[in-house]
């Protein structure tokens, strides 16, 4: 059983502190006497989620109740991920009202129990305002709140955990256990291994220690086992090692060596995709690795001097290394396989509010939560687009007052949750209640910047991002000080009062010196300045309720649940995305932020329409009619011909970091052509700019990329040189075999089939060889014009010629099934009820008519009869009953019946990459294939969200938020 601890809130009263009557809660969105649910229109939706790989239904719940303004994607994700109770039982939640009520009523009850509110009326306003904000997708708690709060199971509310490990076998085994329990609950954990003795140090018995890298192997295997044992997502974990640890070089090289193994196994034919069957044979694949560097090391890199590696037990230097060479080795490893990331230790601890209680040694897997060991953090994120006011004529402003009120509401709720929360270990429970770390943040920053006409990599964009961050964190600490006056400061505050208030002054000083740019950011800065003055005054008077207030998390699943265009602080992925439609199907749409930006930039309606049409057709703004070249940068995205530079991402992180208590979950994407020197530059400049942590990701650096065109890296010049004998030995006689076309006879059997796909009618004639399968296909569309008719004729000829030259039909089926474009939808074929396009329907029909059962079954294509048989018996294949035995005949001797061997089914042909998400759409348009795993739930390509991956289709995430 999972060990849990729970109890009354600690720090609710501090000796000598006079308690007030409680918080007065103001109405911001709600109306007295009217419940927020009564102000929206509700409708029933059917949620049916399928796996794009094989068409199987992953999840189905019909008749769920949601507001009419909720997107299909948000409804699907919230229903499948957050509704509690078994589907089909009376205990199953059936609507958003039940879900929100389960949470907000629990928060209200706990708030009243722990004396947060001045009166029952204030408690009611709190409940209504919280319900309104969740209902209208203004903010979202992290996933554990949606999973657990208000249910009979343990009330775990935290997504992020930091563990610790000491140099003893007992502690190391406890690490394995505690980490496993956290993974079992669907959360993530990180820790620093630097207390463990290196392999270069002696044990008390006289032998050499194993070293942390050795113990990482066991923890990695444990995480992989839990993942494969039925967890809802991959285990999320982080391992960190200090740069002065004697085993640092081995730590840096762990994933590089494993990546080389993966390449060798992949080239030998093994399935080494990130979700493949054979990936478990390699090590260290379940964790993010980071090196913790200090200022001493970075200055040694800058000067080119030596750096000392220190023994763990004595602290003495046992080895001197070239700092610049070690730094380059880190960059080379990150260039080769995206690990390790880097964390800047002195920068992190310079902003530490509780140094008297211990250093900050570790982080959560996504690197945004950084605080004391054996603590946790519960997250919440605000949807920034909800605070942008736009009159439709290009006049915009950021609603500063409403933003601050929502921040106060959310911080209050987050702090209340610590009072009733459960935790996976006793140590984590005690420390979290003693320090009450919170992690408020935001999503949709990239969309906000584009909508306001600001390039992501611009001074104006960075000014808005910094101003919002400053106001958010300042308001959070102000509310924390107000809470301290009501229910007391956190237990560790008395010991850390001086450093905590010093960090508050650092935030305020950074706010005062920030550069103001335009009419959008200036009012936000002004409000932030006033807020930080309140923080300093109230903090000195009351103390603070929370040791930490803000982080910027990836906001993967919750970002999609809020229908955000962008996650965390990320820029937009692309200008064109998929939108799911009510009733099924989807369509490609240009981001709604594009017309907003164009209006802000002064374009007229006719110009905007022409530019949007150009983007819809080409996927970018290059050569868009009437668009000024100086405005191109406003529409730069994470991917594409005009993608944001790597340093553009770093500059944005540096612009935000001074006003975030924790850190920022961010991966800096780099093109495949990036060099090791560029990685070094990013790591070095980020340190100088004051960033706390980052990771880089170079396109195509990992083997686990579906349909990667790369099969091996270029050999280094020294290795590439071959002697004359080697070249001579490699020369072999090559015999070239050319395919021969086998034409059909004059008279050939054929089948003509009519079909309807999404209302479009057509006819298919399939002619075959008398004895050898399909050899010709003709297609004709009804009432579709000469252009489409000509294209279908050309397509038919190309397929027919290929078949006659020997291209197997199953190859065409694997390539063209699941291809998605309009017209798509319902068909009149009982065996193919839904088609994603005309060619999807055609080749599914051809597979059913001409391919043997084993071949098409391997491709996931079955008839209606076979699907029904699978539901009834668990098998698609027809069971042939044996004839009744002749009992009398058994008395006679007879030859043993020979049972023919069943031929092995052909190897499954991988389905081609098709655009089922916005990430895949941009890949198809640009010919780029991003390194991202396929979603383990629905089979679509995932996309990056901070340092994690998120599935746009079903909301699954590889991270801990």
UniProtKB/Swiss-Prot annotation:
Keywords recorded for this protein, A-Z: Cobalamin, Cobalt, Disulfide bond, DNA synthesis, Nucleotide-binding, Oxidoreductase
Group of enzyme by EC: oxidoreductase
InterPro entries named in the record: RdRp_reductase_class-2 (IPR050862), RNR_2_N (IPR013678), RNR_lg_C (IPR000788), RNR_NrdJ/NrdZ (IPR013344), TSCPD_dom (IPR024434)
Active-site residues, Swiss-Prot/TrEMBL: 364, 366, 368
GO MF term (any one): cobalt ion binding
Cofactor binding, note field: 5'-deoxyadenosylcobalamine (coenzyme B12).
SUPFAM superfamilies the record matches: PFL-like glycyl radical enzymes (SSF51998)
Superkingdom per UniProt: Bacteria
Binding residues for substrate: 143, 159-160, 188, 364-368, 554-558
Cofactor entry: adenosylcob(III)alamin
Keyword DNA damage part of the UniProt annotation: no
GO biological process: DNA biosynthetic process
Region (Disordered): 1-23
Gene3D superfamilies named among the record's database cross-references: 3.20.70.20
Stated family: Belongs to the ribonucleoside diphosphate reductase class-2 family.
Known role: Catalyzes the reduction of ribonucleotides to deoxyribonucleotides. May function to provide a pool of deoxyribonucleotide precursors for DNA repair during oxygen limitation and/or for immediate growth after restoration of oxygen.
Assembly behavior: Homotetramer.
Name of the protein described by the UniProt record: Vitamin B12-dependent ribonucleotide reductase
UniProt organism field: Streptomyces clavuligerus
């Amino acid at each position: 059983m999972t060990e849990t601890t729970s109890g009354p809130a600690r720090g609710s009263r501090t000796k000598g502190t006079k308690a007030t009557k409680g918080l007065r809660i103001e109405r911001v969105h709600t109306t007295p006497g009217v419940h927020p649910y009564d102000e929206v229109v509700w409708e029933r939706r059917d949620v049916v989620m399928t796996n794009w790989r094989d068409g199987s239904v992953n999840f189905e719940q019909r008749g769920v109740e949601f507001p009419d303004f909720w997107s299909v994607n948000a409804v699907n994700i919230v229903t499948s991920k957050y509704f509690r109770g078994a589907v089909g039982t009376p205990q199953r939640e059936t609507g958003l009202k039940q879900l929100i009520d389960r949470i907000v009523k629990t928060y209200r009850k706990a708030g009243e129990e722990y004396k947060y509110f001045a009166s029952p009326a204030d408690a009611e306003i709190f409940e209504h305002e919280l319900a309104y904000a969740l209902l209208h997708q203004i903010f979202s708690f992290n996933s554990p709140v949606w999973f657990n709060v208000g249910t009979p199971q343990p009330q775990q509310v935290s997504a992020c955990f930091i563990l610790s490990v000491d140099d003893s076998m007992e502690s190391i085994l406890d690490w394995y256990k505690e980490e496993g329990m956290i993974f079992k609950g669907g959360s993530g954990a990180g820790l620093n291994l630097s207390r463990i003795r290196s392999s270069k140090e002696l044990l008390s018995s006289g032998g050499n220690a194993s070293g942390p890298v050795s113990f990482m192997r066991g923890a990695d295997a444990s995480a992989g086992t839990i993942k494969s044992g039925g967890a809802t997502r991959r285990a999320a974990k982080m391992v960190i090692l200090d740069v002065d640890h004697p085993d640092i070089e081995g730590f840096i090289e762990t994933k590089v060596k494993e990546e080389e193994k993966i390449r060798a196994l992949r080239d030998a034919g093994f399935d080494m995709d990130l979700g493949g069957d054979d990936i478990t044979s390699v090590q260290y694949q379940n964790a993010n690795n980071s090196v913790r560097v200090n200022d001493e090391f970075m200055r040694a890199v800058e000067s080119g001097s030596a750096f000392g590696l220190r023994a763990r037990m004595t602290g003495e230097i046992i080895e001197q290394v070239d700092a610049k060479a070690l730094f380059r080795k880190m960059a080379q490893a990150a260039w080769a396989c995206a690990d390790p990331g880097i964390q800047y230790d002195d920068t992190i601890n310079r902003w530490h509010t509780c140094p008297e209680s211990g250093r900050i040694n570790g982080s959560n897997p996504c690197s945004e939560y950084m605080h004391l060991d054996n603590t946790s953090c519960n997250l919440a994120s605000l949807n920034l687009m909800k605070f942008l006011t736009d009159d439709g004529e290009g006049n915009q402003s950021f609603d500063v007052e409403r933003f601050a009120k929502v921040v106060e509401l959310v911080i209050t709720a987050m702090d209340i949750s610590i009072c009733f929360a459960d935790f996976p270990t006793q140590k984590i429970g005690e420390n979290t209640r003693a320090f009450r770390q919170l992690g408020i943040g935001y999503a949709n920053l990239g969309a906000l910047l584009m909508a306001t006409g600001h390039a992501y990599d611009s001074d104006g964009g960075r000014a808005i991002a910094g101003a919002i961050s400053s106001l958010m964190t300042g308001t959070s600490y102000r509310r924390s000080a107000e809470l301290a006056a009501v229910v007391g400061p956190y237990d560790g505050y008395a010991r850390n009062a001086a450093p905590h208030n010093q960090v508050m002054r650092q935030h305020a000083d950074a706010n005062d010196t920030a550069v103001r740019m335009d009419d959008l950011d200036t009012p936000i800065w002004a409000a932030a300045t006033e807020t930080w003055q309140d923080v300093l005054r109230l903090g000195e008077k009351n103390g603070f309720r929370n040791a930490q207030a803000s982080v910027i998390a990836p906001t993967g699943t919750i970002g999609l649940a809020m229908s955000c265009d962008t996650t965390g602080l990320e820029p937009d992925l692309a200008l064109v995305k998929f939108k799911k439609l009510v009733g099924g199907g989807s369509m490609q749409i240009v981001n709604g932020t594009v017309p907003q930006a164009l209006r802000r930039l002064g374009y007229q309606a006719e110009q905007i329409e022409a530019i949007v049409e150009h983007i819809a057709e080409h996927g970018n703004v290059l050569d868009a009619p009437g668009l000024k070249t100086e405005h191109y940068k406003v529409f730069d995205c994470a991917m594409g011909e005009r993608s944001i530079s790597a340093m553009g991402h770093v500059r944005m992180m540096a612009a935000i970091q001074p006003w975030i208590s924790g850190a920022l979950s961010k991966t800096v994407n780099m093109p495949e052509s990036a060099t090791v020197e560029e990685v070094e530059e990013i790591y070095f400049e980020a340190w100088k700019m004051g960033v706390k942590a980052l990771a880089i990701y170079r396109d195509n650096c990992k083997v686990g990329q579906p349909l990667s065109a790369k099969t091996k890296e270029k050999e280094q010049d020294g290795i590439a040189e071959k002697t004359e004998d080697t070249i001579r030995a490699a020369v072999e006689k090559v015999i070239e075999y050319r395919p021969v076309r086998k034409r059909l006879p004059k008279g050939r059997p054929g089948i003509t089939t009519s079909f309807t796909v999404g209302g479009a009618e057509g006819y298919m004639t399939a002619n075959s060889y008398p004895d050898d399968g399909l050899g010709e296909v003709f297609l004709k569309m009804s009432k579709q014009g000469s252009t489409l008719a000509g294209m279908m004729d050309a397509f038919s000829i190309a397929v027919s010629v290929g078949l006659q030259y020997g291209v197997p039909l199953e190859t065409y089926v694997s390539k063209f099934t699941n291809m998605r474009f309009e017209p798509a939808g319902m068909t009149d074929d009982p065996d193919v009820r839904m088609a994603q396009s005309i060619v999807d329907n055609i080749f599914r029909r051809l597979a059913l008519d001409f391919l043997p059962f084993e071949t098409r079954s391997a491709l996931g294509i079955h008839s209606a009869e076979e699907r029904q048989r699978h539901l009834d018996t668990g098998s698609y294949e027809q069971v042939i009953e044996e004839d009744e035995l002749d009992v009398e005949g058994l008395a006679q001797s007879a030859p043993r019946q020979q049972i023919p061997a069943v031929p092995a089914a052909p190897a499954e042909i991988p389905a081609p990459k098709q655009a089922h998400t916005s990430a895949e759409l941009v890949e198809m348009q640009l010919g780029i294939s991003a390194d991202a795993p396929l979603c383990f739930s629905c089979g679509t390509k995932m996309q990056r969200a901070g340092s994690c991956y998120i599935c746009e289709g079903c909301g699954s995430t590889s991270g801990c938020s």
